Amino acid sequence: MGIRLYKAYTPGTRNRSISDFKELKNNKPEKSLTSSYHKKQGRNNRGIITIRHRGGGHKKLYRQIDFERNKFNIPGQVKSIEYDPNRNTRISLIHYEDGEKRYILAPRGLNIGDKIISSEEADITIGNTLPLTKIPLGTAIHNIEIKPGKGGQLVRSAGTVAQLIAKEGLVATIRLPSGEVRTIGKNCLATIGQLGNVDSNNRSFGKAGSKRWLGKKPTVRGVVMNPVDHPHGGGEGRAPIGRKRPLTPWGRPALGKKSRKNHKYSDAFIIRRRK
């Protein structure tokens, strides 16, 4: 897992760098675990844009990922490590002893041929899934459940890792990659290890087209818009925003104002807010 640098043959390759993909061993996904899906292009069910800057992108198949890791007490073997166009981490194809195949998120250090298992009595080794109550303090974990049986929802991005720092009563305390410290039920599942492709953030796209392949459209600055489109718009020539502070396109405070709503249900579980 490294970074491949381009020579400056063209303006687009001058600052371009991508993953070298050396860890990948299979170019074709498992057909039984893929499906097509309709891109929403950032629209809701009425066709209204609810998320800006989305649209286009290369055609992709969805890989069905096992976030639940609910195949208990049945060992599985890693058959391949594959690229997934829908996320920035790699995925591993697992063949279980009963014949079933599943994709999981590929942790750092998990290699082809390794054995994994989901069990309360599993060893503390990379790729194994256990309840938090069975994991020692200080262990690096990822793909963490918030509600038992719902599947992993936290720490699923490339290179991320959380740490189990305390267990008391019915809850466990974890430190998330953002720096937030929060409590989670001790019966929730988590997977051992740090997620792979840790150099994902070190890539440099180099040109606008690379982002368009990912389905990301340009972000236009509000100061170059018309007044009807943005609070920063208007003026003669290059004009300042004309406000005491920056605003969003909808007139809310931007750039530094905390957007988390007050009295959210999860406030009771957060010990220390993210940095």
From Swiss-Prot:
GO cellular component: chloroplast; mitochondrial large ribosomal subunit
PROSITE patterns associated with the record: RIBOSOMAL_L2 (PS00467)
Alphabetized InterPro entries for the sequence: NA-bd_OB-fold, Rib_uL2_dom2, Ribosomal_uL2, Ribosomal_uL2_bac/org-type, Ribosomal_uL2_C, Ribosomal_uL2_CS, Ribosomal_uL2_dom3, Ribosomal_uL2_RNA-bd_dom
Keywords from the UniProt entry: Chloroplast, Plastid, Ribonucleoprotein, Ribosomal protein
BP terms from Gene Ontology: mitochondrial translation
Chain positions covered by the region annotation Disordered: 224-263
Record's subcellular location: Plastid, Chloroplast
Keyword Ribosomal protein attributed: yes
Domain of life of the source: Eukaryota
SUPFAM superfamilies: Nucleic acid-binding proteins, Translation proteins SH3-like domain
Any one Pfam family match given in the protein's UniProt record, by short name: Ribosomal_L2_C
A single GO molecular function term of this UniProt record: transferase activity
Alphabetical list of Gene3D superfamilies matching this protein: 2.30.30.30, Nucleic acid-binding proteins (2.40.50.140), Ribosomal protein L2, domain 3 (4.10.950.10)
Protein family according to the UniProt entry: Belongs to the universal ribosomal protein uL2 family.
Assembly with partners or alone: Part of the 50S ribosomal subunit.
Protein's UniProt name: Large ribosomal subunit protein uL2c
